[in-house]
Amino acid sequence: MYPAHLLLLLAVCVSLLGASAIPPLPLNLAQFALVIKCADKGKRPRWHYMDYGCYCGPGGSGTPVDELDRCCKTHDQCYAQAEKKGCYPKLTMYSYYCGGDGPYCNSKTECQRFVCDCDVRAADCFARYPYNNKNYNINTSKRCK
């Protein structure tokens, strides 16, 4: 092998080692977004639920600001229950069907069914309650105590 080839091989190996240290992204968030779209018939962009109230988005604390935020708190609690069962809700991919009445789970494993049920219940809840623009991107340190 030529020295240039060895350097290239070394560079590839080092970059792969670095990539293995990157934590995986929550794989089912894109799937959850599709379940939400199915439930609300595409009325609201999915990213609007990523930073709403005290519980919609990463983390969560305090008292939910409204019923929609309460849907997110319940979803967080459902994911916590899934973790207690040994499931990985943010990484679990599942099978669902989008029917005229909304999403339905048809997953095979217990973890897939549990996580899918969490997501479908949350998506149905989102579709049921109004979205208040004043609760998007709020100051959580002041309003979520």
Swiss-Prot record:
One of its GO terms (biological process) is lipid catabolic process. Pfam families: Phospholip_A2_1 (PF00068). Its EC number is 3.1.1.4. This is Basic phospholipase A2 P'513. Disulfide bonds join 38-98, 54-144, 56-72, 71-125, 78-118, 87-111, 105-116. GO terms for molecular function: calcium ion binding; calcium-dependent phospholipase A2 activity; phospholipid binding. Belongs to the phospholipase A2 family. Group I subfamily. D49 sub-subfamily. It is an enzyme of class 3 (hydrolase). It is found in: Secreted. Expressed by the venom gland. Residues 22-27 form a propeptide. Keywords: Calcium, Disulfide bond, Hydrolase, Lipid degradation, Lipid metabolism, Metal-binding, Secreted, Signal. Gene3D superfamilies: Phospholipase A2 domain. Residues 1-21 form the signal peptide. It catalyses: a 1,2-diacyl-sn-glycero-3-phosphocholine + H2O = a 1-acyl-sn-glycero-3-phosphocholine + a fatty acid + H(+). Its cofactor is Ca(2+). One of its GO terms (cellular component) is extracellular region. Binds 1 Ca(2+) ion. Ca(2+) binds at residues 55, 57, 59, 76. PLA2 catalyzes the calcium-dependent hydrolysis of the 2-acyl groups in 3-sn-phosphoglycerides. It comes from Laticauda laticaudata. The lineage of its organism: Eukaryota, Metazoa, Chordata, Craniata, Vertebrata. The active site is at residues 75, 119.
